[in-house]
Amino acid sequence: MQVLVRDNNVEQALRVLKKRMQREGIFREMRARESYEKPSEKRVREQAEAVRRHRKLEKKKMQREGLLPAPKKAVRTR
């Protein structure tokens, strides 16, 4: 993966690199390869992730239909 450094702005180049790596899923893959995961553990983890995704989609669907209140937006202070 290659990132251009413009005007010696290394911080910006690092941000761009991190964003690209996040989008490509490299961080998740690195974490997964740190140690061996048994196939049974992998199945359990993937099933739990699928359940979480399904619940999240159902919650969003109910919010769109007006059955649940919309989530409150966090107030950011600087």
UniProtKB/Swiss-Prot annotation:
Cited Gene3D superfamilies: Ribosomal protein S8
GO molecular function: structural constituent of ribosome
Keyword Ribosomal protein among record annotations: yes
Biological process (GO), any one: translation
The keyword Phosphoprotein is assigned to this record: no
Region (Disordered): 54-78
Superkingdom classification of source: Bacteria
Keywords annotated in UniProt: Ribonucleoprotein, Ribosomal protein
GO cellular component terms listed in the entry, alphabetical order: ribonucleoprotein complex; ribosome
Coiled coil: none
PANTHER family recorded: MITOCHONDRIAL 28S RIBOSOMAL PROTEIN S21, SMALL RIBOSOMAL SUBUNIT PROTEIN BS21M
Family per similarity comment: Belongs to the bacterial ribosomal protein bS21 family.
Stated name of the protein: Small ribosomal subunit protein bS21B
Organism: Agrobacterium fabrum (strain C58 / ATCC 33970) (Agrobacterium tumefaciens (strain C58))
Taxonomic path: Bacteria, Pseudomonadati, Pseudomonadota, Alphaproteobacteria, Hyphomicrobiales
